[in-house]
Amino acid sequence: MKENVYNPLTGKTNLYYDEQEERLKIRIPERANIAMDTVGRFARGARAGHPALIFEEDDGTLKRYSYAELDGLSDRLARGLRGLGVGPGEPVAVHTGQRPETAIAHLAIHKLGAVVMTLSQLYGPDTVAHCLDDSGTRTIITESSVWAPHRDARGRYTSLEHCIVTGGATGDERAFEECLVSDETPLESASTGSEDPALLMYTSGSTGLPKGLLHGHRIVHAYLPTLTLCYNLELDYPDAVFWTPADWAWVGGWLDTVLPAWQHGQTVVASAHRFDAEWAFNFMARHRVTHSFMTPTALKRLAEVSRPRERWDLAIRVICTGGESLPGDVIRWAEDELGIVCNEFYGLTEFNHMAGNCKALFPIVPGSMGLTYPGRRVAIVDDQGNEQPDDVVGEIASWRDDDPSLFLGYWGDPGVPERMMLGGWLRSGDLALREASGYFRYQGRNDDLIKSSGYRIGPAEVEDALVRHGSVAEAAVVAKPDPDRGAVVMAYVRAMPGIETGEPLARELQDYVKKNLAMYKYPRVVEFVDAYPLTSSGKISRRTLRARAAGEAE
């Protein structure tokens, strides 16, 4: 457990974790089920009546669900889904935001041994069509307002048979409430193994369309020790209240916030309200939020608000953060202005929590990614897989060694792809260096993948969307450094002959990508070009374009 973990004071093997050794062991049971290992664990005991979820509507109306109530509603939905033929191993799409129905759907699908496929509300018809068709998904659970732009595209979703809608079904859609089947007989949850597929998340890569990444039921057990550190050893803090503004379709929102809270019988509060810093402070004060996961982008927004402790009676104790690099001044702001702990961690959707912080055990160095977390072997390697000495920039990598937090593979392609391996190392695609103290410092991406505000954006899918617009002959998309978001999408566009370029066309292309891919994937910067710089092999030189974009950002 202590291999490659350093004591920043002595430079030797880290002793900080020793006193927590039992607590931080990764324990993977042979049989596991996310629903039964979280809400189901407390639904029939002394904690059954404790609030598991409190949802605040936009008008301030509150909906409260105890552990027993949430468990019972998920039983009813599971029966309804089973009546539609949903069975073990089958993907069911959940295309909803922070709502009670999202939680109920996740639990119900897991109880059937089926696979939850998370779809962000931000996805446009092109992305949704790809995800549904690639996975062969027959059933989707969505919101009427979210589904509205997809109704006209329904014919493109060739595998889809059942559309379950909250907030008003039309045509052949089924109302969510009608799928809640009552039965006095207790539902017997499917007996799933720890490595059986449980979660399917489509993530962007540096090339091609998004790929369906699979995690097994073991993931909640594999994450628990490292999340214990992220939350500063306070996952079991008495009557804690957890909240995240992050989308529940992503790892940060669901796996890093909701599920660990429910593994400890805690309360989660939620809202579909669009994030706004002033609103967020009001929300946290109103619900006495004690623990939160936020992206660095959200934290930067909070840091722009003056005198928060004077203006709000806050209960917040710990904020953990990840997904992009966090500026050191934001950590200092959290400590000085809020009087709280802000623990940053580093990881990928494929294999998470490689390194991070835990102020309860060791000092936080602002601007660093923290130390290697227990149960991990992390190094900086060169392009041959050789470990690099301290203070040398290389690719951050994790030793495979049957890490239970590792994803199962991609949909239809089990196992870790060869391109991600370098000897026994799992490649991250991120550049970093490790200081002599053992702390890692992020240096940037090693490929074309764009990381903006914590989102992963593949340039190829944005380029494909732009080229489908009739005014575009060719497009090249790169990351443009941005002090607020880490990076933004920048598109170098060559227009069709005779097309007038300028601001009106740039806005039209931005709106086109927003509509067809996702709001967060549109190019915030569009530059029209007559030609592209080329490599010796005649390919577009993305390295040159990235350098140009970086130069323009200065």
Please tell me what each predicted stretch does:
Residues D71-R76, L213-E234, L299-A303:
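Conserved structural elements of the adenylate-forming
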Residues G49-P51, G171, V181-Y202, L209, ...:
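Conserved pre-ATP/AMP-binding loop-to-beta segment of ANL
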Residues H221-T244, W248-H291, V305:
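Conserved AMP-binding/adenylation subdomain of ANL enzymes
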Residues Y123-H130, I140-E143, S292-T295, S398, ...:
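AMP-binding/adenylate-forming catalytic core of the ANL superfamily
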Residues K63-A68, A198-P225:
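Conserved AMP-binding A3 loop
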Residues R79, G83, L107, K111-E178, ...:
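Structural core segment of the AMP-binding/adenylate-forming
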Residues G49, L53-L107, G124-A129, E177:
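Conserved AMP-binding/adenylate-forming core of the ANL superfamily
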Residues Q263-Q266, V289-M294, A303-I364, R377:
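Gly/Ser/Thr-rich phosphate-binding loop
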